[in-house]
Amino acid sequence: MFKTHKIEIEWAGRPLTLETGKIARQADGAVIATYGETIVLATVVSAKNPKPDQDFFPLTVNYQEKFYAVGRIPGGYLKRESRPTESETLISRLIDRPIRPLFADGYKNDTQVIVSVIQYDLENNPDILAMIASSAALTLSGVPFMGPIAGARVGYCNKQYILNPHIDEMPESKLDLVVAGTESAVLMVESEAQELPEDIMLGAVMFGHKGFQPVLDAIIKLAEVAAKDPRDFIPEDLSDLETAMLEMVEQDIRKAYTITDKQERSTAIDVLKTEIINKFMSETEENCKFSADQIATVFKQLQAKIVRSNILDTKKRIDGRDLSTVRPIQSEVGILPRTHGSALFTRGETQAIVVATLGTGEDEQYVDSLTGMYKETFLLHYNFPPFSVGETGRLGSPGRREIGHGKLAWRAIHPMLPTKESFPYTIRAVSEITESNGSSSMATVCGTSLALMDAGVPLVRPIAGIAMGLIKEGERFAILSDILGDEDHLGDMDFKVAGTNNGITALQMDIKIDGITEEIMKIALEQARDGRIHILNEMAKALTSARDELSEFSPRIEVMNIAVDKIRDVIGSGGKVIREIVEQTGAKINIEDNGTIKIASADAKTIEAAKRWIHSIVDEPEVGGIYQGTVVKTAEFGAFVNFFGSRDGLVHISQLTTERVTKTTNVVKEGDKVWVKLMGFDERGKVRLSMKIVDQQTGKEITGDNSIKAEKEKYADTKNNPENKRLRKKKEE
């Protein structure tokens, strides 16, 4: 019934299996991939024909994690998987980026790649396996895909690279790098690093590229026995149109690209494009061989050729800069004084307002993943409204691009954050892109660094980012620092590097062509370092380190630690005690399983009140210590006082005052607030307290020759204390 084909190899010490022919047989391509005991299913379906007037390649990659893969039922009301999580969106992009450039130029059939994690062993991360399975399914499908590609994860620990480290090895690694590519070229890199130097990062890329070569061989072997016949696809030949158009508009395009202002340049290009389309389309129907989409496509190709050749020939950029110059930078902090921290970062025509907000444990984000529920304490949200590029558009939940750019900036900042022990706040940074002409994600990195320092977050060091580009024709190439939007679209590489003066914290690379050598990447990294240092120096004109004090509008958090067996005493039955503390003091209190308690409030007195209350519950009173308490019961022989939390002790009638007392209620009544000294314990272990040697107004011990006289005065104070008078009156009512 099934005609299956299976390839198995040993890869990084674990078995990798690729199998096809048994599941999802109606898809154009389907592969079950197994690594260790993690299993994913990848399917590919591509429409037989493009939609009418389709002017782009509609590729969709959907990565989804099934909770049954780890034997769990999803949380929430519906109890089923729903919209993609942030992690699923990021992995979908991770797969999309290296495969998209390898489809044949001009192929516009609707194509969908769906990858499902159907078993997860909690050791082997499924993202790399999903990428490999997608590549294998595409290679088998018959669509014009010039692959295969493969990917690998690289760690760095004890000065050694690790290929595909286990999940439990990652906390010790100084590097989390994913690299993907073909047999001869690197196409994509995504990474987070602990301030590693450029040579270590480049070495990791090449180590990963070498490491996934056996996987490429396995996919090719599977394709040799299981691939479908290639689809008939002949790219459009528009060379005649290109020749004719070049003669007509070359000089006009060159002239338009001498305009340095983005909006003016875009307007000039749009006018020229409209004119050329109208000119070709104005011919009689029988003489016009080309559609408006074809004319627009060739016009875009001509733009790229002219701009690229001009940069290679003159070493000058669209805006007149040389290859390595960074656009003018202006940095400001504290622009929104009632927020916890804020910054405005402007680089040329790219601008970001970044606002930092500090929160408590209640503000941590709960994330439900295949590995279980965890809490995220650093949030970075990137918003790209349409007005930032002078356009109209929808507003709503963030798209894949916004999520991806935000995560890149998150990776750049994350390694430089203080530890939770030294700075126990939840941190949220929001980047509002107000202008964009290239590298808004790196503007977000710079703005976030400044905003966090303005908020008083003690970053290890400031972080900056820069986007690099590449123009390559044959053996000639030019590496561009701080690329414009047009240079990004028309170039061969988008290469983003973020880090500190000491090293790289994040690296993202997308390469559109083969032939990017190790030497080119090395030059690009060195040029990026120079640009990054320049940007850090410019940022330092606004702020060089975290402010000494938090904003007056920020919450204050103090941390205390208690014994684990005391947690239930602080919480109380059904949360009664902790609710009372919160209600009475106004503080926010978060208790962790290890006994760490975080107390938050904008008012220092509130925090101190909550701390005293908790100490009174968990600490043991000391003999000789003086404590404030409440009279809870009176008797002929004395008064029972509740002190130091839930503890009760007896003040014998002889210890109420130095005067002879015939009736306890002549001195105190139930509800009175009194100061007592712990004298010790009787033979039965009962607490013995004394009031007569404590000043009932100040709570200090009475000493010296005037103690008897003072005590007589304080006896009256105890009866006439305004608080006790109020409590008595309330009781009588």
From Swiss-Prot:
GO terms for MF: 3'-5'-RNA exonuclease activity; magnesium ion binding; polyribonucleotide nucleotidyltransferase activity; RNA binding
Cellular compartments annotated: Cytoplasm
Biased composition (Basic and acidic residues): 708-733
EC number: 2.7.7.8
One Pfam family of this chain: RNase_PH
GO process annotations (BP): mRNA catabolic process; RNA processing
Annotated region (Disordered), positions in chain: 704-733
Keyword Oxidoreductase: no
Domain KH: 555-614
One GO CC term on file: cytosol
Alphabetic keyword roster: Cytoplasm, Magnesium, Metal-binding, Nucleotidyltransferase, RNA-binding, Transferase
Domain S1 motif: 624-692
InterPro entries for this protein: ExoRNase_PH_dom1 (IPR001247), ExoRNase_PH_dom2 (IPR015847), ExoRNase_PH_dom2_sf (IPR036345), KH_dom (IPR004087), KH_dom_type_1 (IPR004088), KH_dom_type_1_sf (IPR036612), NA-bd_OB-fold (IPR012340), PNPase (IPR012162)
Catalytic activity: RNA(n+1) + phosphate = RNA(n) + a ribonucleoside 5'-diphosphate
SMART domains (alphabetical): KH, S1
Main location class: cytoplasm
Cofactor dependency: Mg(2+)
Binding site for Mg(2+): 488, 494
PANTHER family, alphabetized: POLYRIBONUCLEOTIDE NUCLEOTIDYLTRANSFERASE, POLYRIBONUCLEOTIDE NUCLEOTIDYLTRANSFERASE 1, MITOCHONDRIAL
Function per UniProt: Involved in mRNA degradation. Catalyzes the phosphorolysis of single-stranded polyribonucleotides processively in the 3'- to 5'-direction.
Family: Belongs to the polyribonucleotide nucleotidyltransferase family.
Protein name: Polyribonucleotide nucleotidyltransferase
Lineage: Bacteria, Pseudomonadati, Pseudomonadota, Alphaproteobacteria, Hyphomicrobiales
